[in-house]
Swiss-Prot record:
It comes from Danio rerio. The gene is nip7. Belongs to the NIP7 family. This is 60S ribosome subunit biogenesis protein NIP7 homolog. GO terms for biological process: ribosomal large subunit biogenesis; ribosome assembly. Residues 93-180 are annotated as: C-terminal domain.
Length: 180
């Protein structure tokens, strides 16, 4: 387990800023202590500095996971967010999409959100902006990327895709063996 390099930190923070904007600072300097990001086996973990000190007593080859997995770096050094980061990103989300109850299940199975399933969308959402997807009861369901701006969503055909699927809480079941 090691600290992220400058390039890795820049790549990860660019990805996080698509979803939570400048609120990244609030992830690091929290009222309950200082938190940090560490890399282990191409996965980025988010943990308190207390847990970090305790984890140094475990050898690298024996350490499976520590803290919360925020995502992983691909072989081409792109950063992919994991669904395990949802609980930390949801309170700070800048752009949100609410899904109608009939389309929740479709999204949780890994499908994109159609206009017919769109309940609400945050004003001034840009095209290809990272959004957090919520149920109409304000329960965070996952991440997505806006396929259209807020204004385009109002005029588009009901079967057009408005949010591209990135990750959802159904992955806890579908990918339970690969989430660490």
């Amino acid at each position: 387990m090691r600290p992220l390099t400058d390039e890795e930190t820049k790549t990860m923070f660019e990805k996080l800023s698509k979803y939570i904007g400048e609120n990244i600072k609030l992830l690091i300097d929290r009222p309950d202590g200082t938190y940090c990001f560490r890399l282990h086996n191409d996965r980025v973990y988010y943990m308190s500095e207390k847990i970090l000190k305790l984890a140094t007593n475990v050898s690298r080859d024996k350490l499976v996971s520590v803290g919360t997995c925020f995502g992983k770096f691909t072989k081409t050094q792109k950063f992919r967010l994991h669904i395990t980061a949802l609980d930390f990103l949801a309170p700070y989300a800048k752009f949100k999409v609410w899904v109608k109850p009939g389309s929740e299940q479709s999204f949780l199975y890994g499908n994109h959100i159609m206009k017919s399933g769109l309940g609400r969308i945050t004003e001034n959402t840009d095209k290809y902006q990272g959004v957090l997807v919520y149920s109409m009861a304000d329960v965070p369901l996952g991440f997505g990327v806006a396929a259209r701006t807020t204004q385009e969503c109002r005029k588009v055909d009901p079967m057009a895709i408005v949010v591209f699927h990135q990750a959802d809480i159904g992955e806890y079941i579908r990918s339970e063996d690969t989430l660490t």
